[in-house]
Amino acid sequence: TKKTDFNVYGKVTYEFLRGLNAFVDLQYRHVGVKMEGPTDEINWDNNQRIVYNMDESFNFFNPKFGLNYDITPNHRVYASYAIAHKEPTRNNFENNINAELEMPKAERLNDLELGYKYQSKVFTAGAYFYWMNYKDQFVLTGEIDKIGEAITRNVDKSYRLGVEVEAALKPVDWFRWDVNAT
């Protein structure tokens, strides 16, 4: 298997008003995956090594936009929206070929986040809301492949929705206690 990966990334941050800034992250990513010839797997019906011949490429544009607002030196709110992609792994290709399924698709994530954070010298706390909407997400099927690895397959539509809460206490310089819950 041969995998090539190329990406270009840029980020811009602009302060509109004192304490209010916006950012834009942009990434272009190209991934190529090529598999040729026999593998280590055996077709036990004819005692021949299984041949995988495939050549796939993926072009991803992954933008992220957001706003940060420092209400006071101790209080901050933020909002962001991002699109991210993930290419299939070698295992995804091999397992789909073995099961005679269509080729796996790239995963696409639309991610919206809103948050609040309080910070002082001794105590920090934050609450963050997230909504992650997937297209063709890779999820575990509960199946195991021939060598004992967990199998994942594309699911057409799925989402994650939740709140994360975190806090930290640093009463002295040499000790910090962090807790979080999702």
Predicted regions: what they are:
Residues 2-133, 170-172:
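Structural signature of Gram-negative outer-membrane beta-barrels, strongest in the C-terminal barrel
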Residues 134-154:
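Surface-exposed, extracytoplasmic segments of Gram-negative outer-membrane nutrient-acquisition systems
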